[in-house]
Amino acid sequence: MRRPIIAGNWKMHNTTEEARDLVTLLRPLVGTARAEVVVCPPFTAIAATVNAASGSNISVGAQDLFWEDKGAYTGEVSGPMLRDLGCRYVIIGHSERRQYFGETDATVNKKLLAAYRNELLPIVCVGETLAEREAGHTLEVVGRQVREGLKGLETGQARDLVVAYEPVWAIGTGKTATAADAQEVIAFIRKTLGEMYGETAAAIRIQYGGSVKPENIAELMAQPDIDGALVGGASLDAVSFAAIVNYDQ
């Protein structure tokens, strides 16, 4: 039985004080959640978020990391630094990183291996653009992103992996893939993982991301292969995020 995982990606929002306030509001609202709860603040607010979440059932993740552990890489943040701050998870390959910062399947793969090297649990994002979907290339694109992004990952490591399917055309647009559309692609991702990792694929958690809201979470979570959500805007409001986390209550 795969435990559901709901992760909030705060993106470039929340100062340290705002992060502290949000987690303080969130703690009592999600304290009895069956799902695993993760929040991913910007780098500058990680320490404050970890402190505010201490002793609760809220884990903290980062939104990115660099693939080297140290060196002359101005502006970058490494796996050891994230571990030192108390991070448990790290998002890798988010569509905004691919769109604005030139992230590729190859850099996603290097970052994935860096995460495992530093005992961080990766949330690896995959998904097609609107043009790719309209051309009928969704499964081809997503399959390639999965295979290339996870290259070199051993079966024993894959059990702890989280994959997030986030169709690029549904990020921040208010558009959501239907639950059936999301299930179709996520079932394909699980099939691809099965070709790579055999029976272990049944244990890998796969999230949906893309305009997830309290209004659509239950229908998404009712699908057999959807194990959680990567939540953007709705995670910035404690009540909305808690409603998503507590979708089954």
UniProtKB/Swiss-Prot annotation:
The keyword Manganese is annotated on this UniProt entry: no
SUPFAM superfamilies on file: Triosephosphate isomerase (TIM)
NCBIfam families: tim
Any one GO CC term of the record: cytosol
Catalyzed reactions per annotation: D-glyceraldehyde 3-phosphate = dihydroxyacetone phosphate
Gene: tpiA
Entry's localization field: Cytoplasm
Example GO biological process: gluconeogenesis
Organism: Moorella thermoacetica (strain ATCC 39073 / JCM 9320)
Listed GO MF terms: triose-phosphate isomerase activity
Pathway assigned to this chain's UniProt record: Carbohydrate biosynthesis; gluconeogenesis; Carbohydrate degradation; glycolysis; D-glyceraldehyde 3-phosphate from glycerone phosphate: step 1/1
Protein name (database record): Triosephosphate isomerase
Cited Pfam families: TIM
Family named by the database record: Belongs to the triosephosphate isomerase family.
Enzyme type, top EC level: isomerase
Binding sites annotated in the UniProt record for substrate: 9-11, 172, 211, 232-233
EC number(s) reported in the record: 5.3.1.1
Lineage of producing organism: Bacteria, Bacillati, Bacillota, Clostridia, Moorellales
The protein's assembly and partners: Homodimer.
InterPro entries: Aldolase_TIM (IPR013785), TIM_sf (IPR035990), TrioseP_Isoase_bac/euk (IPR022896), Triosephosphate_isomerase (IPR000652), Triosephosphate_isomerase_AS (IPR020861)
UniProt main location, coarse: cytoplasm
Keyword Phosphoprotein set for record: no
